[in-house]
Amino acid sequence: GTASFVDANTMKVVKNDGEIMNVTGTSILLTIGTRPYRPPHIPFDGEAVLDSDEILEIKELPRSMIVVGAGVIGIEYATIFSALDTQVTVVEPRETMLEFIDKEIVEDFAYQLRDRNMKLIFGQKAEKVERDESGKCLVSLGNGRVLKAETVLFAAGRVGATDTLNLSACGLEADSRGRLKVDPETFQTSVPNIYAAGDIIGFPSLASTSMEQGLSLIHI
């Protein structure tokens, strides 16, 4: 089912069978996670222009793919498809990838990826994504260059899945990416009895750290 706030201590739960119930507690922990960021100027179609959830549903292995975003998810999928002999090009507006990892490790990793014939384009933003008459995907970069591939995977970030929680009812407000700010020691939000952990609080947004955050909250 789904849940949303009634007040700081109460949540309305709508079960899959339509039954509605209110659940009350002295403390509430939010670990609702994130979903792919889908900016309006990207023409997602579930067929050739895909987000990181939709890519799991493809029916055929593309011959070529442009991955927009060189974060953890983008690079994970880029290496997977490259290993399956898809010609992969990664586009990233920043000057490097995986910025939170040691620079020397990233440089060596980038060398290995290029050695496997993966193209890495750093310092260029994907300004426009469209499909031509043949169905191929075209990605226009900030420098005027146009890339062509069978598939585009847009993996430039994720947003907190907080829009259905009715946060205003409990006094919370998410940032522009749907994330919640917490005390880094206690994971307490601005509302004293409400806590949040995992991807919903932002960096580093890794499964391992999210698990540790959840475990630490059990003992608070």
Spans of features found by a protein language model:
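Feature captures the FAD/FMN-dependent oxidoreductase FAD-binding
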Residues: 1-25, 120, 128-137
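Short loop/edge segments at beta-strand edges and connector loops
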Residues: 1-2, 7, 32, 51-53, ...
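Short glycine-rich anion-binding loops that position phosphate/pyrophosphate groups of nucleotides
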Residues: 4, 34-35, 157-160
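Core beta-strand elements of the Rossmann-like FAD/NAD(P) dinucleotide-binding domain
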Residues: 18-27, 144-151
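Redox-cofactor binding/interface segments in oxidoreductases and associated redox assembly factors
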Residues: 30-31, 67, 154-155
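FAD-site-proximal beta/loop scaffold in flavoenzymes
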Residues: 45-62, 146-215
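Rossmann-like dinucleotide-binding cores of NAD(P)H-dependent redox enzymes
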Residues: 46, 56-57, 62-66, 72-143, ...
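Conserved small/polar residues in nucleotide/adenosyl-binding loops
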Residues: 218-220
